[in-house]
Amino acid sequence: MSPSAKAAGMVAFAQARKLNNRDRIMDAAATLFRERGYLPVSIEDVAASSGVSRMTFYRHFSNKAALAAALFTRTAAAALPRFLSIRENDYTSRTAVHDWLTTVFAVDQANRNLLRVFIQANVVEPGFSEIAHGFIADIIAGLGREIDAFAARQDVAVERHRWLRGWLLIYEILDQSNHAARGLDPSCDPMVIDILADRFSAFIAA
């Protein structure tokens, strides 16, 4: 092996190891946060659980808030296709919309412990809510590629009212699904999905 090839291999190995450490830290944090909640878990706990030093932790995350933000971003990226899946069905059909919302609520129910973590982080970490609101914007942008009702742009004055209506609709869906996952009444009432399906259908038909 030539010196240049050997050097390239070492660089690739170091990069892969760095990415692996980052994933290990995030995986360990997700497990600890689910088990104990966000506030009680320390950086030392996460480092120990992931098998890395504090120095290695700080190579990837400046603080616990940065870790929570990265974990939310990763979770949101994995969840986005589920929220956009309505595009692949007959979104003009109320039945299809209802089935889609039922799936959204069911998955949030399965991930309720992680949702609690993000709620706690949102309360104590400045800037976390902006990241969460960015996820709503991503959903709207994705839906807008196929569904005209969501194609309005927030930075165009004549379209902003329509965009805000779509933003509030998606926010309400996420909010009620979150509340239902934690067993909060009346969000866990099955009629909530019925009402949201009606509102979604009315929005895209208007």
Q: What are these model-predicted stretches?
A:
Residues 51-61:
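Short hydrophobic/aromatic patch on the recognition helix
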Residues 115-118, 130-131, 159, 185:
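Short, hydrophobic secondary-structure boundary micro-motifs
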Residues 24, 28-36, 78-89, 172-183:
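Solvent-exposed, amphipathic alpha-helical segments
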Residues 1-36, 40-52, 66-69, 91:
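Basic, helix-initiating cap at the start of DNA-binding domains
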Residues 70, 74, 84-110, 162-166, ...:
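Hydrophobic alpha-helical connector segments
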Residues 61, 118-125:
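Short helix-capping/turn signature of helix-turn-helix
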Residues 59, 69-70, 145:
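DNA-binding alpha-helical recognition surfaces that contact promoter or target DNA
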Residues 77-80, 107-110, 126-152, 163-167, ...:
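Amphipathic alpha-helical packing segments from all-alpha helical-bundle domains
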